[in-house]
Amino acid sequence: MNKNLARLRRARKTRARIASQAKPRLCVFRSGRHIYAQVIDDSQGKVLAQASTVEGELRASMGRGADVAAAATIGQRVAAKALAVGVKEVAFDRSGYRYHGRVRALADAAREGGLSF
């Protein structure tokens, strides 16, 4: 089985479990160059908050968007935006990625920023 297909299969199982929790999910996507995070309310089908290394003001200040430091910055930013909207508790959707490196840095920074999961 293809590595990406296996990741997507794991992600599908995780999302099915998260859907029963009835709280917004913090969804992470990482590419070779960037990292993206969204707080999604699946009951309404809306994105409540988002942050990524592609954003203009962050892109200028960050040299590289694909490292652990950038992931930590994105975690803090998405937590601040979620708190501004009134979301304090989320379910963490790591999208089938291992909880290691950039994914872990983003999660730890989001927790430090005030989100609980």
From Swiss-Prot:
Quaternary structure, from the entry: Part of the 50S ribosomal subunit; part of the 5S rRNA/L5/L18/L25 subcomplex. Contacts the 5S and 23S rRNAs.
Biological-process GO terms, alphabetical: translation
UniProt entry tagged with the keyword Iron: no
Gene: rplR
Name of the molecule in the record: Large ribosomal subunit protein uL18
Domain of life: Bacteria
NCBIfam families registered for this protein in UniProt: L18_bact
Alphabetized GO MF terms: 5S rRNA binding; structural constituent of ribosome
GO annotation, cellular component aspect: cytosolic large ribosomal subunit
Region forming the signal peptide: none
Role description: This is one of the proteins that bind and probably mediate the attachment of the 5S RNA into the large ribosomal subunit, where it forms part of the central protuberance.
UniProt entry tagged with the keyword Ribonucleoprotein: yes
Family (UniProt): Belongs to the universal ribosomal protein uL18 family.
Keywords, alphabetical: Ribonucleoprotein, Ribosomal protein, RNA-binding, rRNA-binding
